[in-house]
Design a protein with these regions (language model features):
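C-terminal interaction surface of TIR/SEFIR-family domains
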Residues: 1-46, 110, 115-193
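Conserved BB-loop
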Residues: 39-70, 84-92, 132-136
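Amphipathic helical hotspot of TIR/SEFIR-family domains
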Residues: 69-70, 74, 80-119
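Alpha-helical linker/edge segments of TPR/alpha-solenoid repeat scaffolds
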Residues: 253-258, 290-296, 329-340, 369-373, ...
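Amphipathic alpha-helical repeat scaffolds of TPR domains
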Residues: 167-182, 201-214, 236-253, 274-293, ...
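Helix-turn-helix repeat elements of alpha-solenoid scaffolds
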Residues: 179-193, 214-228, 251-265, 295-304, ...
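Alpha-helical junction/boundary sensor with strong preference for TPR arrays
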Residues: 198-203, 229, 236-237, 266, ...
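TPR/TPR-like (Sel1-like) alpha-helical repeat modules
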Residues: 311, 325, 342-343, 373-390
Length: 433
């Protein structure tokens, strides 16, 4: 489904590429914000913008000058995505100053910084206005998205466009709040009903559909998630994120031919050059599923290698990092796994992150990889308490912990420390039997 004309009539078209220009816009970000950026990437592609996404072009460790050579230098505009979680001062300062210099020297180049949360900006960035997307944690939408597109083209918004943008901002914010409220209360039916409400923010970008699908996956409503995400894919055929989530839902459900279908989706993305940590991470997960069925160590090693590739490409990506660590432990490469786990804890710390289930249980798993059973059990409990209705997330976390304990051989008392936070899963399974 193309973006509705009601929205397109206000959206500026991409500028023509002049001599030497290859891209309409260059996106610069840290991998921790990759899902948000993928949604921006998808909508820009849908609007026929040529987009340079450095995560797809660059392997971690490359020098900035090298990656800018064919990216930023040959782009009409640059968007720098900033959040507190990605506030690596060296990276932010380098990328910001590079784009600022380019904008100063070339009036045709449009530099648009974007912030994803309400925290204060770094001091060096105080002189430039940032586009504020703090109300859109899962991807751009609403009037802010329209304003961003105007900013990268350098066009001015008409009064009608401004009024339209303000209305869309309110509609999108209302939908996001409704979706997250339904996730908190475990109300999958309301999530599906919201998707079928068919108001304009659902038709503009895939971000709301992805949020709905991901919430259903977290609630272990895999059938509903798959059906919804297939609809999002049909509406936004160029979008990457719905396909990733569709594959994840299939892998989590694990019925009949689900694993093969998930691998086909991800292998196609991989073959098309999509090597971002999310694609690699979910693909790696399906190889682990194959190992659980086959017992073939080659499948386990393939899983670990894809996770490790994702982590090398994005060293701040804790999801691929912790899985590279844990799969190394399962391969009897304990020292390697413990070293990666230690590095992750140096990056994110050893304290629970309020409201962030996955970061908190990542800390727990890194502690488990290092045989710190009491601390790991305590951290798992804090993660469960943050998201008590996310049974799908709990099952995935517990499954990994069980595999690790089989390899690490804790004492019965140590095993009980890890199992205690997950007792509700056993009770729930007994009730559903």
């Amino acid at each position: 489904m193309p973006i509705p004309q009601q929205w397109l009539q206000f959206a500026p078209k991409p500028r023509d590429l002049a001599n030497g220009e290859k891209w309409n816009v260059f996106l610069s970000y840290r991998s921790i914000n990759r899902n948000w950026v993928l949604n921006l990437y998808d909508v820009l592609k849908e609007l026929d913008y040529k987009v340079f996404l450095d995560q797809y072009e660059i392997i971690g460790g490359d020098e900035l000058i090298q990656r800018l050579q064919d990216g930023l230098t040959n782009s009409q505009s640059g968007i720098l995505i900033w959040s507190t979680a990605a506030s690596d001062s060296v990276w932010v300062d380098k990328e910001y100053q590079t784009m600022e210099t380019r904008a100063t020297r070339d009036p045709r180049f449009k530099f648009v910084p974007v912030k994803l949360d309400g925290k204060p900006l770094p001091i060096f960035a105080a002189n430039r206005v940032f586009e504020d997307f703090s109300s859109y944690p899962d991807g751009p939408n609403g009037g802010e998205l329209l304003r961003l597109i105007y900013a990268i083209t350098g066009e001015h918004m008409s009064k009608d466009a401004i009024d339209f943008a303000n209305k869309q901002s309110q509609l999108a914010a209302d939908m996001i709040n409704e979706l997250n409220a339904a996730k908190i209360t475990g109300d999958a039916e309301s999530i599906v009903q919201l998707y079928h409400s068919n108001i304009l923010p659902w038709k503009t970008t895939a971000s709301l559909g992805c949020t709905a699908g991901e919430n259903l996956i977290k609630l272990r409503k895999y059938n509903e998630a798959i059906e919804l995400l297939q609809g999002v894919e049909n509406d936004f055929p160029k979008a990457i994120r719905p396909r990733q989530l569709h594959a994840l839902a299939l892998a989590r459900r694990g019925q009949n031919d689900d694993l093969n279908q998930a691998q086909r989706i991800l292998a196609k993305l991989y073959a098309a050059g999509e090597r971002d940590p999310e694609t690699l991470g979910i693909f790696a997960r399906t190889w682990m599923d194959r190992y659980n069925k086959s017992g073939d160590t080659a499948d386990l090693r393939q899983s670990r290698n894809y996770y490790e590739d994702g982590y090398k490409r994005a060293p701040d990506d804790n999801y691929t990092g912790i899985n590279a660590a844990s799969k190394s432990v399962l391969l009897d490469e304990y020292e390697k796994g413990a070293a990666i786990a230690k590095k992750i804890l140096e990056n994110i710390g050893t304290q629970a992150v309020p409201g962030d289930y996955w970061t908190t249980v990542t800390i727990a798993e890194a502690l488990l990889d290092q045989k710190q059973y009491a601390d790991a059990g305590n951290m798992y409990q804090q993660g469960i308490d943050m998201a008590p209705m996310e049974y799908g997330s709990h099952e995935s976390t517990w499954g990994q912990a069980q595999l690790l304990m089989e390899k690490l051989k804790p004492t019965p008392d140590e095993r009980a420390l890890i199992a205690k936070p997950f007792m509700h899963l056993l009770k729930r399974a007994a009730q559903n039997a």
